[in-house]
Amino acid sequence: MLAELHEELETIRERFANLRGHLDLAAKQAEIEQLEVRASDPELWNTPRVAQELMQRLTRLKEEVALWNDLDHRMTSLAELIELAEQEGDESLAADLAAELRAVQREVAQRELEILLSGPYDDRDAFLSIQAGMGGTDAQDWAAMLLRMYTRWAERRGYTVNLIDLSEGEEAGIKSATIEIRGPYAYGYARAEAGVHRLIRLSPFNAAHTRQTSFARVEVMPEVDDAPEVEIKPEDLRIDVFRSGGHGGQGVNTTDSAVRITHLPTGIVVTCQNERSQIQNRETALRVLRARLLERELQRQAEERARLRGEYREAAFGNQMRTYYLHPSTLVKDHRTDYETSNVQAVLDGEIDPFIEAFLRANVRES
């Protein structure tokens, strides 16, 4: 068994070496040194938001480089232990060494997946918006189910989730919601979920419990402090303030602290009412607007590339990217990758990583 472990580890180390070659850790180390120089400048903290973004980027880069180096050291130590056990003919250690090998194998697979996140903003935090579509109250309930699913998914990954805006439905569910997801590669993973999600089930909102099809659209945007693709001019903005509303329209705050920003050239409207002050809501709304404008430009570029390949499809409600069947059978099927599972409840509880991984790997094959 020790000889088999040795051969298997060598295969894993070859995969690992190939991954490191794609990653260019030297470039990341150089960026770390550049950011450390900028971080030492006292004037950086005159703009706290920029300073915070820089420090987050620096921390993530250091963590990423440390992860790769630690994994390299683990494999080296494991190889030495296997070799020592082979020399001594001690098979009693085989079970423990095999367990460590499996752990290393899982870690390499995780690093391999992150290599697929090679987009310019994949390592950023994300804003995720959900909009109820066709289906009335059922669609609004479906949007609320998706909000719970993504919140649970983010929490499972150790991400931080902040509610930015929420518009509740008249009878049940939500009309729309926007959350901020903060953590390593939040946008890179979450962008796999952008598109139209379809639910087929027996409606709990009518006496006959007839079969109902509901739709909701999910948008995912990278959070960036600045991007060359985006320019926001003050004269292009209309900013309105209003009183934050809770369930049933009850006022939450004693002052008009909620903010609505309209980007006049594009018609994009962003609201934020979850922060404590009007100034904070305005700053958050501007961050969401910047992210929406960037995602709009990235989508335009992607559509142009798709047209050149003859693959363009309009993002219409008939072009759902995933269907969740609760009746007559239970199944979740992704129409982009054909990945599916019958464990619908687990998916709705946030276990969507297999769908995300299938999407990322399919994108690499297409490119």
Curated annotation (Swiss-Prot):
Modifications the protein undergoes after translation, according to the UniProt entry: Methylated by PrmC. Methylation increases the termination efficiency of RF2.
Cellular component GO terms held in the UniProt record: cytoplasm
GO molecular function, one term: translation release factor activity, codon specific
Compartments, as annotated in UniProt: Cytoplasm
Keyword line: Cytoplasm, Methylation, Protein biosynthesis
UniProt KW Protein biosynthesis keyword: yes
Disulfide bond sites: none
Any Pfam family: RF-1
Origin: domain of life: Bacteria
Keyword Protein biosynthesis in record: yes
Sequence positions bearing N5-methylglutamine: 250
Family annotation (PANTHER family): CLASS I PEPTIDE CHAIN RELEASE FACTOR, PEPTIDE CHAIN RELEASE FACTOR 2
NCBIfam families on file: prfB
Protein family according to the UniProt entry: Belongs to the prokaryotic/mitochondrial release factor family.
Free-text function comment from the UniProt entry: Peptide chain release factor 2 directs the termination of translation in response to the peptide chain termination codons UGA and UAA.
Protein name (database record): Peptide chain release factor 2
